């Protein structure tokens, strides 16, 4: 079977951009979609993002660092001492004014790594590193040894 995979990532609450990307992928004949995390925030999109995502054949999804930020804010892991944490608390408060809790539960269930096999080729899908979905280890100016963490004996 011929596969056309559209890779979605870093939506960050931008409903307009997600609509445009999905439309473009559909016009190009995408047969499946892989979502690499960061669905919510800081943009204003909420339920409509998940409605769009449920309208496409999403066959792999991993949790991104902003997804974790939302969960950490909801779980009371942020305080009022750090301005960044205050901002995330306020953004999450706005988010939860209309976001269905079923979507929060879905995000909470997402793994950090998904393994896929397509036509005999093995993929390892992550938002960043297999055990860490945040940080700058993969920036181009950094030591390339960090890229080795993306490959294992189950990845081509």
Language model regions located:
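Acidic active-site catalytic centers that drive phospho-/nucleotidyl reactions
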Residues: 10, 38, 65-67, 127
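Active-site environment of divalent metal-dependent phosphoester hydrolases
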Residues: 12-17, 41-44, 67-71, 132, ...
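Short, basic, glycine/proline-bearing loop/turn elements
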Residues: 32-37, 129-135
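Active-site neighborhood of divalent metal-dependent phosphoester bond hydrolases
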Residues: 50, 56-116, 122-125, 137-154
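N-terminal active-site segment of His-dependent metallophosphoesterases
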Residues: 1-56
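Glycine-rich phosphate-binding loop signature in dinucleotide/nucleotide-binding domains
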Residues: 25-30, 118-119, 153-155
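General secondary-structure edge motif
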Residues: 5, 33, 75, 86-87, ...
